[in-house]
Swiss-Prot record:
UniProt feature coiled coil, ranges: none
Keyword DNA repair: no
Pfam family, one: Glyco_hydro_1
Annotated PANTHER family: GLYCOSYL HYDROLASE, MYROSINASE 3-RELATED
Name of the protein described by the UniProt record: Isoflavonoid 7-O-beta-apiosyl-glucoside beta-glycosidase
Enzyme active site: 205, 419
């Protein structure tokens, strides 16, 4: 298969779609705070800044493996997935990895963030139960293919697909036993792949795994308090989220310790963790709302960053959660503190925060412990355009604010933005040509990158940006109804097609001096008066061609 070929006239056709201004009809408040974005490209960033895309094993790979908790969850409870689908095939990267690396090469990407499937490597969850050579061979082939194309692998050790065997045996992350099993699994990964992998991420979005899996019950393993949702598989949202997070932190720290003691000196790599953080904007200028915004940050990003930098949970969590919050022993605190070389930040949206007293409304729950209420609106006006899925508002300035907050509060750590993106709904009524036009996605990336550059200019130690995602894929409880990809996937044939955003990235990231001089500003995107993202679907200027 081959990549799309663009002749000079087609390039001109593309650039005709790309205007010198990047104006979005944002809601009034956002329009007042977002600066019109001038032209810039990759040469506007430091020379060592890395651009990549991100993916995960369960969402991408397909092919046979023993079950993870997500295999079990999607098969046992298909009604909990928007379209009843699962990741059995996903986008079949297991068989299409060479094509996918070719896409990355076409897009001029520097790096690819992938994850390793724990049950694909260790069917029982432990090396004592045998190592799956087929799984090891797949990751070796993928890593080698990336390196052969000058693409740097960033590897996540755990992106939510825990072996079902360990969940069945002792409850997974509810049990402290997981810490040793996680460490040993990571040790094996370092041994197998660390000669070529120089950037490791221990855990992806531990707060989301914890909150959605053990408080809301909408992600595997589907646990929550019965009073919140009687269809959950069991659970207690007042204790389990904090316990799971505690064991995730200890698993992370034990893994970092192994890497630094056994591998880092001779493998010359670095290791960190990826956290999703929603930026918190006080609903008003009141002291109460400002404190609410800080508490929200404490209960999300601070939940993990405070232990990693100070060896203990945020004071607000200790006070409000009380005895339900696990405590680090002296030795554990020493192990956890400083256990990172970098912090990965996954940023998608921001929210308004105000105080609420939930202390007497309901049984104790992580969902109410912070005593805040968050909203996407202030006085009926959204903080930013709402994406089709409804949970995300596009607020690029929040990324700059978050990066500068981390710089000031956590002593300016090395940061990679390990995910950023926006969704669109799968719409079978659209033609293929229409499905490839995503100027709103280009505009969103352009503005986020503008604010990343601004944060760097203000001293934030940011060294990379990964778009979510390379391809449309299985989006957890949204199944295949939500498309985040820069490249369109026909889920029946598994054929890949470049969206306009993929080709925009190709030229934004071009190193060729003549191409780099071109104005690759974001095209104008259309937004409805209700601030729900919509797009005028125009036929592309190039022939639709699979690769």
């Amino acid at each position: 298969m081959h990549a799309m070929t663009f002749k000079a006239i087609l390039l001109l056709g593309l650039l005709a779609l790309v205007s010198t201004s990047a104006s979005i009809a944002f809601a009034k408040e956002v329009r007042a705070t977002i600066t019109e974005v001038p032209p810039f490209n990759r040469n506007s960033f430091p020379s060592d800044f890395i651009f990549g895309t991100a993916a995960s094993s369960y969402q991408y790979e397909g092919e046979g493996r023993v079950p993870s908790i997500w295999d079990n969850f999607t098969h046992q409870y298909p009604e909990k997935i928007a379209d009843g689908s699962n990741g059995d095939v996903a986008v079949d990267q297991f068989h299409h990895y060479k094509e996918d690396v070719a896409i990355m090469k076409y897009m001029n990407l520097d790096a690819y963030r992938l994850s390793i499937s724990w049950p694909r490597i260790l069917p029982t969850g432990r090396a004592s139960g045998g190592i799956n050579s087929t799984g090891v061979d797949y990751y070796n082939r993928l890593i080698n293919e990336l390196l052969a194309n000058d693409i740097t692998p960033f590897v996540t050790i755990f992106h939510w697909d825990l072996p079902q065997a360990l969940e069945d045996e002792y409850g997974g992350f509810l049990n402290h036993t997981i810490v040793n099993d996680f460490r040993d699994y990571a040790d094996l990964c370092f041994n197998l792949f660390g000669d070529r992998v120089k950037h490791w991420i221990t855990v992806n979005e531990p707060s989301i795994f914890t909150m959605n899996g053990y408080a809301y019950g909408i992600f595997a393993p589907g646990r929550c308090s019965p009073s919140y949702n009687p269809t959950c598989t069991g659970g207690d949202a007042g204790t389990e989220p904090d316990l799971v997070a505690h064991n995730l932190i200890l698993s992370h720290a034990a893994t970092v310790q192994v890497y630094k003691k056994k591998y880092q000196e001779h493998q010359n790599g670095i290791i960190g963790i990826s956290l999703q953080i929603i930026w918190a904007v006080p609903l008003s200028n009141s002291t109460s709302d400002q404190k609410a915004a800080q508490r929200y940050l404490d209960f999300t990003g601070g939940w993990f960053l405070d232990p990693l930098t100070a060896g203990q949970y945020p004071e607000s969590m200790q006070y409000l959660v009380g005895d339900r919050l696990p405590k680090f022993t002296t030795d554990e605190a020493k192990l956890v503190k400083g256990s990172f070389d970098f912090v990965g930040i996954n940023y998608y949206t921001s929210s308004y925060l105000t105080s609420s007293d939930a202390s007497t409304c309901c049984p104790p729950s992580y969902l109410t412990d912070s005593q805040v209420t968050f909203s996407s609106q202030r006085n009926g006006v959204f903080i930013g355009p709402v994406t089709p899925s409804g949970w995300m508002c596009i607020y690029p300035k929040g990324l700059r604010d978050l990066l500068l907050y981390i710089k000031e509060k956590y002593n300016n750590p090395l940061v990679y933005i390990t995910e950023n993106g926006m969704d669109e709904l799968d719409d079978p009524s659209q033609s293929l040509e229409e499905s490839l036009i995503d100027t709103y996605r280009i505009d969103s990336y352009y503005r986020h990158l503008f604010y990343v550059r601004s944060a760097i200019g203000s001293g934030a130690n940011v060294k990379g940006f990964f778009a979510w995602s390379l391809l449309d894929n299985f989006e957890w409880n949204e199944g295949f109804t939500s498309r985040f990809g820069l490249n369109f996937v026909n889920y029946t044939t598994l054929t890949r097609y470049h969206k306009l955003s993929a080709t925009w990235f190709k030229y934004f990231l071009a190193r060729d001096q003549e191409i780099a001089k071109l104005d690759i500003s974001a095209p104008k995107a259309r937004w409805s008066s209700s601030t729900m993202i919509k797009e005028e679907k125009r036929k592309p200027k190039w022939a639709i061609q699979a690769f």
